[in-house]
């Protein structure tokens, strides 16, 4: 049985849209608020098994309406959802990631690197949430464990700079990870590369 994944990141919901006038900001906010629903529709249409959201879903502290829009969309997407908070929406005490009651199909990674096993999909998903506005290199000395057919990680990290304060990730770390798929967010530029047996995708 194959595994179908939808991977996205960096929605920055409730961005202030600085530099735009009021009417432009209203239009941009309306368009931005449609992202969760459109993503859920795509997930259902494609019959995805997993929805991976690799950080910065919110730009900062979101409005109540925005949180409810996201929760509703995720509850209706028809997939298991894994979210890793990023540097803009990091998981600190009092964070909505900790305080909100998320739908049953949603798992938010709220601390250091951890794994969730899904036996019915023969899959193990790793992830970690930012605790502050920066993150150490989480894949340093990391090696995926378990006998599952699919070993996946979702992280908010930077594969372009070894000295990045935002979870720097090197090709060697990816190669040594033992993962089949690494889902990244952060750099706002889509792309992919193979390192060993791992496919690494950076999503926007």
What is the meaning of each model-derived region?
Residues 50, 60-204:
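His/Asp/Glu-rich metal-coordinating catalytic cores
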């Amino acid at each position: 049985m194959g595994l179908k994944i939808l991977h996205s990141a960096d929605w920055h919901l409730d961005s202030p849209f600085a530099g735009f006038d009021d009417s432009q900001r209203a239009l941009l906010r309306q368009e931005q608020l449609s992202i969760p629903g459109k993503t859920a529709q795509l997930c259902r249409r494609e019959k995805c098994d997993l929805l991976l959201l690799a950080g910065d879903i919110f730009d900062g502290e979101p409005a109540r309406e925005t949180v409810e829009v996201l929760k509703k969309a995720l509850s209706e997407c028809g997939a298991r959802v894994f979210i890793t908070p990023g540097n803009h929406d990091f998981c600190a005490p009092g964070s909505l990631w900790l305080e909100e009651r998320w739908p049953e199909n949603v798992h938010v990674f709220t601390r250091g690197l951890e794994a969730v096993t899904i036996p019915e999909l023969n899959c193990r998903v790793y992830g970690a949430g930012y605790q502050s506005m920066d993150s150490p290199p989480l894949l340093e000395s990391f090696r995926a464990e378990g006998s599952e057919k699919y070993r996946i990680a979702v992280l908010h990290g930077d594969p372009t700079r070894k000295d990045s304060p935002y979870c720097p990730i090197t090709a060697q770390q990816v190669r040594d990870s033992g993962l089949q798929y690494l889902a990244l967010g952060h750099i706002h530029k889509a792309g992919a590369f193979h390192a060993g047996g791992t496919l690494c995708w950076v999503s926007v």
